[in-house]
Amino acid sequence: MKIAAAALMAMSLIAAATAIRAQEEGAPQSGRRGAVGPVQSEKYHTQYIRLGNQAEALLYEPAGTPKSTALIFIHPDRNTFTAPVGPQMADRGYRVLMINYRGDAEAREANQDQYLPAISTGVTFLRGLPGVQKVVLTGHSGGGHLVTLYGNIAEHGSAACKDADKIYPCTAQGLDGLAKLDGVVILDSTLGAFHAMSSVDPAVDTSNNHRNPDLDMFIAANGYDPAAKKASYSAAFAKRFYAAQAARNAKIVNDALARLKAIQNGTSDFSDDEPFVVEGMGDQASGARLYQPDTSFQAHTKAQHLLLKADGTNVMTVIQSMRPPVGQRTGSALKSLSVMTQNTTVKRFLATSATRTAANYAITADDVIGVDWHSSFNMSAGNAEGISVPALVMTMSCHYLVVPGEIIYDHLASKDKSYASVEGAVHGFSPCKPEYGDTVKRTFDYVDTWLSRPGRF
């Protein structure tokens, strides 16, 4: 929604949030992260900002005179306040507004289109601060597809997320007239709805109790090493697997559309939405993904890009993913509700995960082919085609997103766009081995360098 100047003046700027604590990723404390320290530093201070009635933010302000470019950071987990982007970029002289969307608070995650009006409010808020001349939207991981979704709709209106190509249209209010951006920074992003689709286990039909051994990526006969929890799949198995994964995905999407029709025509038990449980479909980073135990998939980019090396040099080269095999818990948790089951609703599934593929669908060493990048409004590559402002895509080379990052980069309409990868950095920016040095510093130094280039904005 658009926020008038009077409304902005009414936003509460509460005292510095000294009690807010940083939180560790993945700490097993009732699903929450553990406290590790206050969000304060000699180089910056923070203020809690209320953005209307559906969002909150933490504003990082540098101790000295801030730079004229300000950043917004967004992530769908709605827990952004202590993400590294805030303190790292504030250390480098930037104001950073870390936004948490709080609408639909009872749900673990809201549909991505629901976040956008709050982001727009944040853009307008930053533009009202003294000295701010440019506003750049930044997202990491799942926040990357929020960045591309916002950027596309801010430039082209809500028609961009409800055209005939979409399996399910955006439904949020207030998507026309979103505040325009001056640039975007996309950090180690997933591909959006396709990331969910790629977790579908084709060895499952409708029940985890019955697995098809011809399609089971977690058995030795197909190339999986259960002791080492890594794999080497044959080309024949991969071809069979991807064909079956696409077929099962199409059935799941069609089942969801049939239930949507039942809701709409009144034959469902529910009038607004209904439960939708998909066994054998991974939750977030879990799933039946060949590229997790077998690193020959999504192994390298097609083209040369800038590699930020540990020795301080920057070289143009094909980016190699140096990750170890991952996804070790999936094979031993195939019947887990929290690991290998989508426990969602019909409308949420269609809005966040429904993807259309073609007969040639496959994930290769350097590409993802046969995906309709316009079939979901929650698709990073499709939305990137609607972004014309300067754009930076960064990947972490000790993770499996170097190829998705290149796909997003290739689809960007921006004339001024850059792709850079950080040698030896994992998804959370730290080094996978000590010899790769301070990968966190290298990452955010480059973001600063890119933002600061004269004439960029």
Functional labels for PLM-detected ranges:
Residues E25-P66, C432-D438:
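N-terminal cap/lid segment of alpha/beta-hydrolase-fold proteins
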Residues K67-P76:
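Short beta-strand element of the alpha/beta-hydrolase
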Residues E423-G428, C432-F457:
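Catalytic active-site module of serine/aspartate enzymes centered on a nucleophile-bearing elbow/loop
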Residues E109-P130, H145-A154, S158-D163, T443-D445:
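Alpha/beta-hydrolase active-site loop
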Residues I387, V393-T395:
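Short beta-strand/loop motif that positions the catalytic acidic residue
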Residues H399-G405:
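Conserved alpha/beta-hydrolase "acid-adjacent" motif
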Residues F218-G382:
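Alpha/beta-hydrolase
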Residues M89-E106:
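Conserved alpha/beta-hydrolase
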